[in-house]
Amino acid sequence: MADLSSRVNELHDLLNQYSYEYYVEDNPSVPDSEYDKLLHELIKIEEEHPEFKTVDSPTVRVGGEAQASFNKVNHDTPMLSLGNAFNEDDLRKFDQRIREQIGNVEYMCELKIDGLAVSLKYVDGYFVQGLTRGDGTTGEDITENLKTIHAIPLKMKEPLNVEVRGEAYMPRRSFLRLNEEKEKNDEQLFANPRNAAAGSLRQLDSKLTAKRKLSVFIYSVNDFTDFNARSQSEALDELDKLGFTTNKNRARVSDIDGVLEYIEKWTSQRESLPYDIDGIVIKVNDLDQQDEMGFTQKSPRWAIAYKFPAEEVVTKLLDIELSIGRTGVVTPTAILEPVKVAGTTVSRASLHNEDLIHDRDIRIGDSVVVKKAGDIIPEVVRSIPERRPEDAVTYHMPTHCPSCGHELVRIEGEVALRCINPKCQAQLVEGLIHFVSRQAMNIDGLGTKIIQQLYQSELIKDVADIFYLTEEDLLPLDRMGQKKVDNLLAAIQQAKDNSLENLLFGLGIRHLGVKASQVLAEKYETIDRLLTVTEAELVEIHDIGDKVAQSVVTYLENEDIRALIQKLKDKHVNMIYKGIKTSDIEGHPEFSGKTIVLTGKLHQMTRNEASKWLASQGAKVTSSVTKNTDVVIAGEDAGSKLTKAQSLGIEIWTEQQFVDKQNELNS
C-alpha cells in the first residue's frame, strides 16, 4: 500500500507538471497519449482505492455529477465594473483626474480578455469556491465547472486564505474545434469565443465543460494581507509564484503617452494572439495610491477600460443572395471574399434591405467596408467608389420570389419586400425551423439541415407532420444513427406535452410573440376557445394590439390552418394551457395583483425567469409603462421605460431589491 501511495503522489506530480506545460506554458514536453495514459492509471487507482482520492487530484479536471441548478452566492466584496474610455481624449481626461488627486503616477497596462469574469476562493491553499460576476453583488456558484479548467490551480503553492479574480475565456483553437463539432452534429454554432465560454461555464454537467478546453487569466487579488506587494505589478508577480496564470503581455508605463503607445501596439497585434481581447485595462500601479483614490458606487476611480472600436476591414463583394424568412420577408445577403473580422472569418454579411443597398451605393464587384456590429453580427458599412471596377453591377431586387416565383410586394409603411404566397417552400422550411425552436416547441435534435432533408424528401410538409415521423423515416437520413434517432423521437414525443402558449408561438402567427402567446393561452385556456374569438374581443386584452388581433383572427379563420390544428390533435399534441392563471394565484401581497414592468439587463436571472416567477406570485407582467403600472424593475442600462416611470412617479426597484424580496419570501 505504501508503494501505491508513492505512485499516486508521483502521478499527481507528473500530471500537474504536464498540465501546466500544456495549458499554461503552451509548451508540452510529452504527447497527449502519454498524459491520457497516466490520467487513466490514476482514475483506475482512485476507483479501486477511494481513500487515495484527494480534493486536488488531477482527476477532478474530468468533471463530476451533473447539478440540478446553480446556487446564488453573495460576493465577500463586490465585483465592480470599470469605467470606459473610447478614445485618446477620454484617456487624457482620466489621467488628468488622477494627477489632480494624487500627483505623479505610474500605470499598469493589461490586455482586456474577452471572456467571463470569475472569482476564486482559496482556503488553506485549496480551491473551494468559484463564482460568476453576476450583478457584482451576487454571482452563481460554478465551482465544479471551474475545477475542469487546467489553468486554475486546485491547490496553491502556499497554504493561504485568499480570493482572486480573473477572466475565464475560450482560446481560439478550442472555439474553432467546438464549432466544427457542432456543425457536424447540425447544431447551432456559437457566434464568438466569449459566448462559447459563457455557455460552457453554465453547463449543469461539468463533464461537458471539461470537453470545451477553457482557460483563465487571473488579474487581481481581493486582500493583500498575505502578499508582500506594494503595486499591481508586484501582486501579479506574486500570483505567478503561487501557481496562478496571469497574462504576461502587461507593461508598466510612466505616463499617459506610454499608455497610448501600449494601446497602439496591441490594437495592431491583437489578431496575433491565441485568444480574443476587446480592449486594454489601465490601472494606477501603486496600491497605496489606489486606496487613496477609492471607489465610486460602480467602479474604482483608479482604473479604466479602453474599448477597441469596432474593427473595420475591406474586402470584395462577390455577389448578393436572397433569403426568405418564415413571414415572407426577402433579405439580401452580401457574399464576400472571405476576410477575418474580429477574430473570425467572414464570408457573408447582412445588407438588411433594398433601400440600404441603394442609399449606400453598394454594387456587386465593389470593394466594401465590413464590420461586426457589437463584435458579433457582420454587416456591410459602405462601398469604396474610388476603387470601383468598370464591370461593377448595380443591384436590383427581383420582382418575383426566388423560391416559389410568386410576385413580391412591399406593404405600405414597410421597407422590406415580401412574398405573400402561403405555399412558398422557403417560408415553409423557415416556419418548420421556428416551430421546433427553443421558445416554441423546443424539439432538441431537429436542426436546420435535418429539417431541410425531411422537407426535400417529402417526409414533412407542415408542422404536424413532425409528429408522424417514424424510425424508418429518420434512419436513412445523413448522420442519423440509431441513438440519435431514438433521442429525436423521444424529444418529439415530449413536445406533445407542451403548454398551449408554446404551440401558439410555434405556429408562427405574424406579430404574435412569446409574451402575447402567453397572454392568449392564459386568457382562453384551450385552442377551441381561441378558434371562436373575434377581433373586437382581442383588442380589449391588455398587451394585444390591433395588429396582433387582426393577424390572429385571420390566421385562425383559415380553413387550411383549422385542418392543420386537427391534424395535430389527431397525434395528441396538447392544446390546453398548463400554467397557473394569474387571477387564480394567491401570491404574496408584495406582488399579487400588481402590474409590473421589467426593463434593462438582468444579471441574476433571465427576463423570462423573472416574468415566470412574478406570474407565480400573482403579478401581471406587461411590456409598457402606463399610469396603471405599479412597479418597474430596472436592470442595467434601463432606458426610456425607466425615464417614463420616474416622470409618472411609479415605484422603482433595482434588480438587487427585487432579488432581496424574493429571498425574503423564500426564507
Curated annotation (Swiss-Prot):
Binding residues for NAD(+): 32-36, 81-82, 110, 133, 167, 283, 307
Residue ranges that the Swiss-Prot or TrEMBL entry lists as coiled coil: none
Q: Which UniProt keywords apply?
A: DNA damage, DNA repair, DNA replication, Ligase, Magnesium, Manganese, Metal-binding, NAD, Zinc
InterPro entries assigned to the protein according to its UniProt record, in alphabetical order: BRCT_dom, BRCT_dom_sf, DisA/LigA_HHH, DNA_ligase, DNA_ligase_AS, DNA_ligase_CS, DNAligase_adenylation, DNAligase_N
Residues engaged in binding Zn(2+): 401, 404, 419, 424
Instruction: List the GO cellular component terms.
Output: cytosol
Q: Which GO terms describe its biological process?
A: DNA repair; DNA replication
Q: Does the keyword NAD apply?
A: yes
BRCT domain ranges (all copies): 586-667
Q: Which NCBIfam families match?
A: dnlj, PRK07956.1
Q: What does this protein do?
A: DNA ligase that catalyzes the formation of phosphodiester linkages between 5'-phosphoryl and 3'-hydroxyl groups in double-stranded DNA using NAD as a coenzyme and as the energy source for the reaction. It is essential for DNA replication and repair of damaged DNA.
User: Could you say which protein family the record assigns here?
Assistant: Belongs to the NAD-dependent DNA ligase family. LigA subfamily.
Q: What is this protein called?
A: DNA ligase
- The species is Staphylococcus aureus (strain MRSA252)
